């Protein structure tokens, strides 16, 4: 769904953003069908974190780029000046990731500033709208590398 509406997501009220994200999560089962690729695109993983405050499982669909045996994601929040909640939840427990219907525990590391240009180029190839997100926000968008445990 972000492929269809992602360019304006920064203007949405928080409740709409959460609703669309929820629908997107439920549509992940269609990821490998023609319809699924049109609506949600390929290169989407499902990140599962534990909420820092709620202690509940939080699922977030994210666009990723492959790099060696890892997955690169951006904490872009559609170019918002606010950092997404899932990013803050990473510090609590190791996250789980589902990619191509395979779920696994993952570790993560923040990508250093000196490496960001290279990894942004990988992400931009997958989803060119990331370029707009970087222009739209005043914050330095964190890039995260997830690897299997």
PLM region spans:
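Short secondary-structure transition/capping segments
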Residues: 12-18, 124, 144-149
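Compositionally biased, charge-rich terminal segments
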Residues: 1-15
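Short beta-strand micro-motifs in enzyme catalytic cores
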Residues: 45, 140-144
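Short, conserved active-site entrance elements at the starts or edges of catalytic domains
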Residues: 12-51, 57
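Short beta-strand segments
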Residues: 42-78
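Short, structured beta-strand-loop surface elements
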Residues: 77-130, 136-140, 148-149
